[in-house]
Amino acid sequence: MRELVATSLRHRGFSVLSVPNAEVALQILMEQVKFDLLFTDIVMPGIIDGFELADRAKRLQPDLKILYATGFAHVSRRSIDTLHGKLIQKPYRPDELATEVRRALESDGARA
């Protein structure tokens, strides 16, 4: 699924680096590779979930925009706003994701 999403975003003009888990993402961020947006599922393989990944990533790159994905209805928008991110609910269509990625990239960091 991860690679399908990455391919869909690439076909819509986005530059995408897809990694298998949060640990790898953090390793890349610690190498001071600059990213505009972190798109992460809240529930992921490995020890670190999407919330913790975003928190650590923001400490490394304070201007990084965050877009969370979840299939769980109990995740509130208020929780996401508190963590300075945006949320897309699964399942989503590729065009919906592209729209949300654009919105997140264009946001000024204020709550939506």
Regions found by a protein language model. Name each.
Residues 30-33, 56-64, 76-83, 103:
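Conserved phosphotransfer cores of two-component systems
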Residues 23-30, 98:
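Alpha2 helix of the CheY-like receiver
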